[in-house]
Amino acid sequence: MTTFSVPIDNGDSMKIAEEESQRTLYPYVTGTSIVAIKYKDGVLMASDMGGSYGSTLRYKNIERVKAIGKHSLLGASGEISDFQEILRYLDELTLNDNMWDDGNSLGPKEIHNYLTRVMYNRRNKFNPLWNTLVLGGVKNGKSYLGMVSMIGVSFEDDHVATGFGNHLARPILRDEWHADLSFEDGVKLLEKCMRVLLYRDRSAINKLQIAKITEEGVTVSQPYSLKTYWEFSSFHNPTAGAAGSW
């Protein structure tokens, strides 16, 4: 006769089951900068498609710009899994809004305020969502662009950038942005910013998407690459002239 030993449950399995599930305590797979601007017809947003596992460029096909409802566009840098969690929150929010069927829909300002409260709430629980979010949109003919940090700090502006782009792209935008930008000029300005980030940010890759939102809706471009030039002398010997270098 075959006998089987049955382990005695001392209650540990119940304790494990009852423990609250944990989210990201430290970022693992992250995306780099998002750059967004207002232009005369709406909002443009650019991001590359890289996902870094620590310092290793592990994934090269991650979309970090998503349409939210009818009037909004969301981009995120930081932890990819937390961005997916935020998208689940927003799916639930827009579903509940649509269930009212009252002819109204959430605009970009409402979604921006909602995300601000979500990020601040998670920060107060010492379990933040490890992202910086960019929210753009158009409703009733008015363009809207704002940003939320991982600790719930939010603001609106005519152009925003996250991550390394906040240091390298914003100076370019301050010099060259103006309110009457056409779509073509806006795309060229974003491509200039993304090219600078590609040269200087180790986490950036030469595969990007540019999304547009207007009163007509959201359009996200197919992934494409920028023309680059790597023959600058400083690229061949980046430490030349620095103290202690050869």
Swiss-Prot record:
InterPro entries: Ntn_hydrolases_N, Proteasome_alpha, Proteasome_beta4, Proteasome_bsu_CS, Proteasome_sua/b, Proteasome_suB-type. Pfam families: Proteasome. The active site is at residue 24. Signal peptide: none annotated. Residues 1-23 form a propeptide. The keyword Zinc does not apply. It is found in: Cytoplasm; Nucleus. GO terms for cellular component: cytosol; cytosolic ribosome; nucleus; proteasome complex; proteasome core complex, beta-subunit complex. Ubiquitous low levels, higher expression in siliques and flowers. Keywords: Cytoplasm, Nucleus, Proteasome, Zymogen. CDD domains: proteasome_beta_type_4. Its main location: cytoplasm. GO terms for biological process: proteolysis involved in protein catabolic process. Component of the 20S core complex of the 26S proteasome. The 26S proteasome is composed of a core protease (CP), known as the 20S proteasome, capped at one or both ends by the 19S regulatory particle (RP/PA700). The 20S proteasome core is composed of 28 subunits that are arranged in four stacked rings, resulting in a barrel-shaped structure. The two end rings are each formed by seven alpha subunits, and the two central rings are each formed by seven beta subunits. The catalytic chamber with the active sites is on the inside of the barrel. Non-catalytic component of the proteasome, a multicatalytic proteinase complex which is characterized by its ability to cleave peptides with Arg, Phe, Tyr, Leu, and Glu adjacent to the leaving group at neutral or slightly basic pH. The proteasome has an ATP-dependent proteolytic activity. Belongs to the peptidase T1B family. This is Proteasome subunit beta type-4.
